[in-house]
Amino acid sequence: MDAVDAPRRPLSERLFADLLEAVLSGRYGPGDRLPPQRALAADAGVTMTSLREALKRLEQMGLIEVRHGAAMRVRDWRRHGGLDVIAHLLLTSGSLDRGVLSDVLEARTLMLGELAALAAQRRSPVQAQGLVALAGEIGRAADDAAAQRLDFAFFEQLAEAADNLVFVLILNSIRELYFAHAERLAVTARHRELAPLYGAAARAVTERDRGGARDAVTRLAALQRQRVEERLG
Protein backbone atom coordinates (compact mmCIF):
# COMPACT_ATOMS: atom_id res chain seq x y z
CA MET A 1 0.00 0.00 0.00
CA ASP A 2 1.39 3.42 -1.00
CA ALA A 3 1.90 6.07 1.68
CA VAL A 4 -0.78 8.14 -0.08
CA ASP A 5 -3.26 5.28 0.27
CA ALA A 6 -2.35 4.38 3.87
CA PRO A 7 -5.28 4.88 6.25
CA ARG A 8 -4.94 7.87 8.51
CA ARG A 9 -5.06 7.38 12.26
CA PRO A 10 -8.33 8.43 13.92
CA LEU A 11 -8.31 11.98 15.28
CA SER A 12 -8.71 10.71 18.84
CA GLU A 13 -5.62 8.50 18.46
CA ARG A 14 -3.50 11.34 17.10
CA LEU A 15 -4.67 13.65 19.87
CA PHE A 16 -4.00 10.95 22.45
CA ALA A 17 -0.43 10.58 21.13
CA ASP A 18 0.14 14.34 21.26
CA LEU A 19 -1.20 14.70 24.81
CA LEU A 20 0.68 11.62 25.98
CA GLU A 21 3.96 12.99 24.66
CA ALA A 22 3.23 16.31 26.37
CA VAL A 23 2.78 14.51 29.70
CA LEU A 24 5.77 12.16 29.35
CA SER A 25 8.09 14.94 28.17
CA GLY A 26 7.15 17.17 31.13
CA ARG A 27 5.45 19.84 29.07
CA TYR A 28 2.53 19.14 31.38
CA GLY A 29 4.10 18.29 34.74
CA PRO A 30 2.66 16.42 37.73
CA GLY A 31 -0.12 18.46 39.33
CA ASP A 32 -0.52 20.78 36.32
CA ARG A 33 -4.01 21.64 35.20
CA LEU A 34 -4.85 20.77 31.62
CA PRO A 35 -6.65 23.43 29.57
CA PRO A 36 -10.45 23.16 29.55
CA GLN A 37 -11.80 20.48 27.27
CA ARG A 38 -13.38 22.90 24.81
CA ALA A 39 -10.10 24.78 24.50
CA LEU A 40 -8.16 21.56 23.91
CA ALA A 41 -10.64 20.42 21.27
CA ALA A 42 -10.56 23.79 19.50
CA ASP A 43 -6.75 23.98 19.51
CA ALA A 44 -6.47 20.45 18.10
CA GLY A 45 -9.29 20.93 15.60
CA VAL A 46 -11.19 17.88 16.80
CA THR A 47 -14.67 17.19 18.08
CA MET A 48 -15.45 16.90 21.76
CA THR A 49 -16.14 13.20 21.18
CA SER A 50 -12.63 12.62 19.83
CA LEU A 51 -11.14 14.63 22.68
CA ARG A 52 -13.02 12.65 25.32
CA GLU A 53 -11.86 9.38 23.78
CA ALA A 54 -8.24 10.57 24.00
CA LEU A 55 -8.65 11.79 27.57
CA LYS A 56 -10.30 8.52 28.60
CA ARG A 57 -7.24 6.59 27.42
CA LEU A 58 -4.93 8.85 29.39
CA GLU A 59 -7.12 8.44 32.45
CA GLN A 60 -7.11 4.66 32.08
CA MET A 61 -3.31 4.72 31.96
CA GLY A 62 -3.31 6.63 35.25
CA LEU A 63 -1.71 9.73 33.73
CA ILE A 64 -4.47 12.29 34.29
CA GLU A 65 -7.21 12.76 36.85
CA VAL A 66 -10.63 13.76 35.57
CA ARG A 67 -13.30 14.81 38.05
CA HIS A 68 -16.73 16.03 37.12
CA GLY A 69 -16.94 19.78 37.58
CA ALA A 70 -13.22 20.14 38.40
CA ALA A 71 -10.10 20.86 36.36
CA MET A 72 -8.26 17.94 34.80
CA ARG A 73 -4.88 17.43 36.44
CA VAL A 74 -1.75 15.60 35.34
CA ARG A 75 -0.52 12.78 37.56
CA ASP A 76 3.08 11.72 38.07
CA TRP A 77 3.62 8.97 35.48
CA ARG A 78 6.59 7.59 37.43
CA ARG A 79 4.27 6.85 40.34
CA HIS A 80 1.07 5.95 38.52
CA GLY A 81 2.14 4.65 35.09
CA GLY A 82 2.19 0.97 34.17
CA LEU A 83 3.75 -1.26 31.55
CA ASP A 84 1.75 0.40 28.79
CA VAL A 85 3.77 3.61 29.33
CA ILE A 86 7.05 1.87 28.45
CA ALA A 87 6.24 1.54 24.76
CA HIS A 88 5.58 5.27 24.48
CA LEU A 89 8.71 6.19 26.43
CA LEU A 90 10.77 3.87 24.25
CA LEU A 91 9.60 5.53 21.04
CA THR A 92 9.61 9.23 21.85
CA SER A 93 8.54 11.31 18.84
CA GLY A 94 9.09 8.28 16.61
CA SER A 95 12.74 7.77 17.53
CA LEU A 96 14.17 5.14 19.86
CA ASP A 97 15.17 6.41 23.32
CA ARG A 98 18.48 4.67 23.99
CA GLY A 99 18.32 5.23 27.76
CA VAL A 100 14.87 3.67 28.06
CA LEU A 101 15.93 0.82 25.77
CA SER A 102 18.93 0.11 28.01
CA ASP A 103 16.60 -0.10 31.02
CA VAL A 104 14.24 -2.41 29.13
CA LEU A 105 17.04 -4.75 28.10
CA GLU A 106 18.48 -4.80 31.61
CA ALA A 107 15.08 -5.68 33.08
CA ARG A 108 14.58 -8.29 30.35
CA THR A 109 17.82 -10.04 31.26
CA LEU A 110 16.92 -10.18 34.95
CA MET A 111 13.35 -11.27 34.30
CA LEU A 112 14.18 -14.03 31.82
CA GLY A 113 16.85 -15.52 34.08
CA GLU A 114 14.41 -15.90 36.95
CA LEU A 115 11.72 -17.09 34.55
CA ALA A 116 14.02 -19.93 33.46
CA ALA A 117 14.76 -20.94 37.06
CA LEU A 118 11.04 -21.15 37.84
CA ALA A 119 10.42 -23.11 34.66
CA ALA A 120 13.06 -25.66 35.65
CA GLN A 121 11.26 -26.15 38.94
CA ARG A 122 7.66 -26.23 37.69
CA ARG A 123 7.65 -27.42 34.09
CA SER A 124 5.57 -30.33 32.88
CA PRO A 125 7.10 -33.04 30.66
CA VAL A 126 5.17 -31.69 27.67
CA GLN A 127 6.43 -28.14 28.27
CA ALA A 128 10.02 -29.39 28.57
CA GLN A 129 9.65 -31.23 25.26
CA GLY A 130 8.24 -28.09 23.67
CA LEU A 131 11.25 -26.04 24.77
CA VAL A 132 13.68 -28.62 23.39
CA ALA A 133 11.80 -28.63 20.08
CA LEU A 134 11.81 -24.82 19.83
CA ALA A 135 15.51 -24.65 20.65
CA GLY A 136 16.18 -27.03 17.78
CA GLU A 137 14.01 -24.99 15.42
CA ILE A 138 15.92 -21.82 16.28
CA GLY A 139 19.18 -23.50 15.30
CA ARG A 140 17.65 -24.54 11.96
CA ALA A 141 15.87 -21.23 11.27
CA ALA A 142 16.33 -19.99 7.72
CA ASP A 143 17.21 -16.45 8.77
CA ASP A 144 17.39 -14.09 11.75
CA ALA A 145 13.79 -12.91 11.26
CA ALA A 146 12.46 -16.46 11.48
CA ALA A 147 14.65 -17.05 14.53
CA GLN A 148 13.22 -13.94 16.16
CA ARG A 149 9.67 -15.27 15.91
CA LEU A 150 10.84 -18.57 17.40
CA ASP A 151 12.71 -16.69 20.13
CA PHE A 152 9.49 -15.08 21.31
CA ALA A 153 7.70 -18.43 21.17
CA PHE A 154 10.53 -19.98 23.23
CA PHE A 155 10.13 -17.41 26.00
CA GLU A 156 6.34 -17.66 25.88
CA GLN A 157 6.72 -21.40 26.44
CA LEU A 158 9.21 -20.69 29.23
CA ALA A 159 6.67 -18.38 30.89
CA GLU A 160 3.97 -21.02 30.66
CA ALA A 161 6.34 -23.59 32.15
CA ALA A 162 7.15 -21.18 35.00
CA ASP A 163 3.43 -21.18 35.79
CA ASN A 164 3.45 -17.50 36.75
CA LEU A 165 0.55 -15.47 35.37
CA VAL A 166 2.35 -12.13 35.74
CA PHE A 167 5.21 -13.21 33.48
CA VAL A 168 2.70 -14.50 30.90
CA LEU A 169 0.80 -11.18 30.91
CA ILE A 170 4.03 -9.16 30.63
CA LEU A 171 4.93 -11.04 27.46
CA ASN A 172 1.40 -10.54 26.14
CA SER A 173 1.67 -6.81 26.77
CA ILE A 174 4.92 -6.38 24.81
CA ARG A 175 4.21 -8.71 21.86
CA GLU A 176 2.79 -6.06 19.55
CA LEU A 177 5.59 -3.58 20.26
CA TYR A 178 8.24 -6.29 19.94
CA PHE A 179 7.18 -7.36 16.47
CA ALA A 180 6.36 -3.85 15.25
CA HIS A 181 10.01 -2.92 15.83
CA ALA A 182 11.60 -6.34 15.34
CA GLU A 183 14.21 -5.06 12.90
CA ARG A 184 15.59 -2.57 15.42
CA LEU A 185 15.21 -4.97 18.35
CA ALA A 186 17.44 -7.51 16.62
CA VAL A 187 17.83 -9.94 19.51
CA THR A 188 18.49 -12.87 17.16
CA ALA A 189 21.10 -11.32 14.87
CA ARG A 190 23.57 -14.09 13.91
CA HIS A 191 21.12 -16.53 15.46
CA ARG A 192 23.19 -19.65 14.83
CA GLU A 193 25.80 -18.36 17.28
CA LEU A 194 23.07 -18.08 19.91
CA ALA A 195 21.40 -21.43 19.19
CA PRO A 196 23.52 -23.50 21.63
CA LEU A 197 22.33 -21.36 24.55
CA TYR A 198 18.67 -22.05 23.75
CA GLY A 199 19.58 -25.73 23.73
CA ALA A 200 21.45 -25.46 27.03
CA ALA A 201 18.50 -23.66 28.63
CA ALA A 202 16.03 -26.24 27.36
CA ARG A 203 18.17 -29.11 28.65
CA ALA A 204 18.57 -27.48 32.06
CA VAL A 205 14.80 -26.97 32.33
CA THR A 206 14.26 -30.60 31.32
CA GLU A 207 16.73 -31.74 34.01
CA ARG A 208 15.13 -29.42 36.59
CA ASP A 209 18.47 -27.66 36.96
CA ARG A 210 17.40 -24.23 38.24
CA GLY A 211 20.90 -22.75 38.34
CA GLY A 212 21.81 -24.07 34.91
CA ALA A 213 18.62 -22.76 33.37
CA ARG A 214 19.10 -19.34 34.96
CA ASP A 215 22.73 -19.12 33.83
CA ALA A 216 22.03 -20.21 30.24
CA VAL A 217 19.15 -17.78 29.77
CA THR A 218 20.99 -14.91 31.49
CA ARG A 219 23.97 -15.42 29.15
CA LEU A 220 21.61 -15.62 26.18
CA ALA A 221 19.80 -12.41 27.12
CA ALA A 222 23.12 -10.60 27.68
CA LEU A 223 24.32 -11.60 24.21
CA GLN A 224 20.98 -10.54 22.74
CA ARG A 225 21.41 -7.15 24.36
CA GLN A 226 24.77 -6.85 22.61
CA ARG A 227 23.12 -7.71 19.29
CA VAL A 228 20.59 -4.90 19.71
CA GLU A 229 23.26 -2.37 20.69
CA GLU A 230 25.42 -3.40 17.73
CA ARG A 231 22.50 -2.94 15.33
CA LEU A 232 21.77 0.53 16.68
CA GLY A 233 25.45 1.51 16.49
Q: What does each of the following model-derived ranges do?
A:
Residues 37, 55, 135, 198, ...:
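Short amphipathic alpha-helical/adjacent loop interface patches that line ligand
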Residues 37, 163-165, 208-209:
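Short loop-to-helix capping motifs
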